[in-house]
Amino acid sequence: MSLFLSERDPGLREYMDDPDCDLEMLHATYRQFETVNKLIGGWKRIYKTHMRPALIEAGGNASILDIGCGGGDILRLLNGFCRDDNLDVQFTGIEPDTRAIEFINKQSWPDHFTFLNSSSDELVHQNQSFTVVISNHLIHHLSPLELNGVCRDAEFLANKRVIFSDIERSFIGYFCFRTIAPLLFKNSFIVADGLRSIRRSYQKNELSPHLPDGWSVHRQLPFRLLAIYKGGKS
């Protein structure tokens, strides 16, 4: 690995996290996330391997919670997979950033979607539960203490399984994104923040010690880490 990426750089701040960032650029970023996650998020494989069996087992009471849902694109993507499998699933996204919720509220959503300006610990205090709990690109934003707290919340909230997906830091991934992304994504924070996200992200051996007991870390191509908890309340 290049010395440049030999260690995480958790002190980097992403432009879209600035409360004073340009709103048009921010909204364009939310819109373009859908393309990014379709291309490299690997959520169809995650769904088939880790989510679908639990959702089928839950029958007509299946539900998915997305912690830190951003603009809601992951839930929209998963809804398509569930619909293809004739699964009735309730979708809930929580997001503490009011700007994301305002963006979401301007979009059209099916009746079985709910979005809340909330955090995971608030849902724990409300004693809520979901079949599967997920997050996407959340881990690298959190301090070790925050990560432990969100993992514990997710353990409580999930009846069947938790899957947290994030980038794995690598020179090849950084180089590929730096080369290709500027050709695809304009007038947004996707390129600049994507590169910063890679620099902030973990490698597999770095992430494992920061997760509570009962969690495991798996690699998934391209350049993904999945933190998975297979416990649950039922």
Identify the meaning behind each predicted range.
Residues 23-46, 54:
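Class I SAM-dependent methyltransferase Rossmann-like catalytic core
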Residues 142-153:
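A short, conserved alpha-helix within the catalytic core of class I
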Residues 1-31:
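N-terminal, positively charged/glycine-rich alpha-helical extensions of SAM-dependent methyltransferases
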